[in-house]
């Protein structure tokens, strides 16, 4: 059984026992989180939402809040002595999907 959820402006396919990375959520590690924006549930029978499936939710446990590996943003204009170097680390939350309720 798997479901398609919406979080952080993205759609993710999740199943029970799966670990996922999502945009940072404002909760602490070891707490539980519930996704109510379930777009579809696939199992013995398929349920599609318009736009969401009524009564469906996905429960997850927060493993950790962290920041991704640093990337370098380098802007450059030739012959103009313009160089701008900037780093960025995206914040994310790692979750363990515990239950899909449809």
UniProtKB/Swiss-Prot annotation:
Origin species: Phytoplasma australiense
UniProt record similarity statement: Belongs to the bacterial ribosomal protein bL21 family.
InterPro entries in alphabetical order: bL21-like (IPR028909), bL21-like_sf (IPR036164), Ribosomal_bL21 (IPR001787), Ribosomal_bL21_CS (IPR018258)
UniProt name for this protein: Large ribosomal subunit protein bL21
Assembly with partners or alone: Part of the 50S ribosomal subunit. Contacts protein L20.
One example GO MF annotation: structural constituent of ribosome
Alphabetically ordered keywords of this record: Ribonucleoprotein, Ribosomal protein, RNA-binding, rRNA-binding
Matches recorded under Pfam families: Ribosomal_L21p
GO biological process, one term: translation
Function in brief: This protein binds to 23S rRNA in the presence of protein L20.
GO cellular component: cytoplasm; ribonucleoprotein complex; ribosome
SUPFAM superfamilies listed in its UniProt record: L21p-like
